[in-house]
Structures are given as C-alpha cells and as structure tokens.
Amino acid sequence: LNKNSHVKAQRNAMTNDLRNAIKKRDNYTCCICGNSIYKEPNLLLEVDHIVPISKGGKTEADNLQTLCWRCNREKSNN
C-alpha cells in the first residue's frame, strides 16, 4: 500500500463502535490530563492514534487512546 492508501484504510477503520469501545475501555477519561465526563459532564472526548496514521500507525485498540479535545489539540504528530 502506498501512504495515501494506508491513511485512507486506517481512517475508514475508525468506526463509531470502535470509538465507543475505546472510550469505555478508558473509562471516559483523558489518558493525558485525567479529566473525565464524571468531572465535566459535557467534556468532548476524542479517540486519538498514539502512533499517528501519517507515521504508519494503525487503527487498532492498542494504538488508540481517549483524549479530551484540549489535550488532542495540544498533541503533535511527533
């Protein structure tokens, strides 16, 4: 697969069911700052690739983590 095919395939692999499973696994808590929907009920949680897709990361449970929107925006692809 070329890089564009890899990126498209991995993005398509991120289903709503997978997103929900990762958030549940992580107890609806940001893996960086520890904020959660229990502390901030309207907190926007996102599922993040630990190793970015752009660097060869895969959309698999062991490469995914729950982050609050603030931490996800501050995280770079490095």
Q: Language-model features: where?
A:
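Histidine-centered nuclease catalytic patch
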Residues: 35-67, 77-78
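Short, charged surface segments at domain edges that flank catalytic/cofactor-binding sites
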Residues: 1-34
